A protein has these predicted regions:
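Well-ordered, non-membrane alpha-helical segments in soluble/globular domains
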Residues: 1, 96, 100, 129-137
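Conserved catalytic-core segment of nucleotide-activated headgroup transferases in glycan assembly
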Residues: 1-25
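Active-site donor-binding acidic/aromatic loop of nucleotide-activated sugar
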Residues: 23-36
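Short amphipathic alpha-helical segments and helix-helix/interface helices
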Residues: 39-40, 63-64, 136
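C-terminal alpha-helical cap of glycosyltransferases
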Residues: 122-145
Length: 145
């Protein structure tokens, strides 16, 4: 089953329904438009793979939630291309390869995935000493100290 969360408002839009119905999953009736839900509640019940496609929102907090939970994250965020299962831009063929890779290899590589995810999360952790130090340096440079 494919749950397309945060798409319920699009469910009656002709282009969206045309797109969904053009896919095998849409024709088979296994893709559904869903409301917006707290990620962890929904993921714990329904998610095997998280696919996040963004346009001008490459630091969406859902990426971090998926990484923190060790969910296989298939995404096109250039800011996180070294973690998860990255595909560039709007490249649907590369996205399909990334989804296949996540589905077939994630469990076998989970320990390395967790290490990579933790390293990525540490870069944005507001309590990490390195982040605090960099922020302090930038403030000092801005203030001329």
């Amino acid at each position: 089953r494919i749950y397309m969360t945060n798409t319920l408002k699009l469910a009656t839009h002709p282009l969206f329904t045309s797109f969904v119905n053009s896919t095998a999953a849409g024709r088979a009736g296994i893709a559904s438009a869903e409301d917006r839900y707290p990620f962890i509640d929904y993921a714990a019940k329904y998610v095997d793979i998280v696919v996040c496609h963004q346009w001008e929102n490459g630091l969406n907090y859902h990426y971090y939630e998926a990484l923190h939970g060790s969910y296989p994250l298939v995404h096109n965020s250039p800011f996180l291309k070294d973690v998860g299962y990255y595909y560039p831009d709007f490249d649907i063929d590369a996205a399909a390869v990334a989804i296949h890779d996540a589905a077939t290899n994630h469990d076998d590589n989970i320990e390395q995935y967790k290490l990579d995810a933790q390293a990525a999360l540490e870069k944005v952790n507001p309590f990490a000493p390195k982040v605090i130090d960099e922020y302090r340096q930038r403030l000092q440079a801005l203030m001329g100290d």
